[in-house]
Regions:
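Beta-strand repeat architectures
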Residues: 1-14, 22-95, 102-124, 132-168
Length: 168
């Protein structure tokens, strides 16, 4: 299928609103700035965002309230770990996503990877995930809408002043 690869080295990239590609959004390097769910492909399918390259720093920065849940898809966009990745949520921003998922390529690249949550805003996961990645909450809040959002994570670290909250 068609997908988008962000390979910005140490730069930043923003995608236009109302993108209709049906595949995934893959972050190999650099920072993908996200301010609207429609920037990440067709919202009827709500394909995942994937961190793909352990050799380079990969960041997804959420700059405004983005709710990736879609009535048509029946779920929020998942974040898939094939490499280390950082989700930075700007101050005052509350963003809703699906689950933190394992590597779907069969290569088990989520094992040994780390998701780092930075920024003063709130990253809300609305489903239980499958990743075996380590999870670091360095700033802001990581919130779960279900009781066990990270059942297989290799570790969970919450820094001073950061918050981890589970729901239901």
């Amino acid at each position: 299928g068609v997908y988008v690869v962000v390979d910005a080295s140490d730069g930043q990239v923003s995608l236009a609103n109302n993108n209709s590609y049906l595949g995934t959004t893959q972050i190999a390097s650099g920072t993908l700035m996200v301010s609207d769910n429609s920037q990440l492909g067709d919202t009827h399918y709500n394909r995942q965002v994937i961190f793909t390259d352990n050799q380079q720093e990969s960041v997804m920065e959420i700059t405004s309230d983005v709710d990736t849940r879609s009535d048509a898809a029946g779920h929020g966009r998942d974040i898939e770990m094939r490499a280390d990745g950082e989700v930075a949520v700007d101050a005052g921003v509350d963003t809703q996503w699906g689950a933190l998922m394992a590597d779907s390529s069969g290569q088990h690249q989520d094992e040994g990877s780390t998701l780092t949550k930075t920024g003063a805003g709130t990253l809300e996961l609305t489903a239980s995930g499958t990743t075996q990645s380590a999870v670091r909450v360095e700033e802001g809040t990581l919130k779960g809408d279900v009781a066990d959002i990270l059942p297989y994570a290799s570790s969970l670290w919450v820094g001073d002043g950061a918050t981890f909250v589970t729901g239901a």
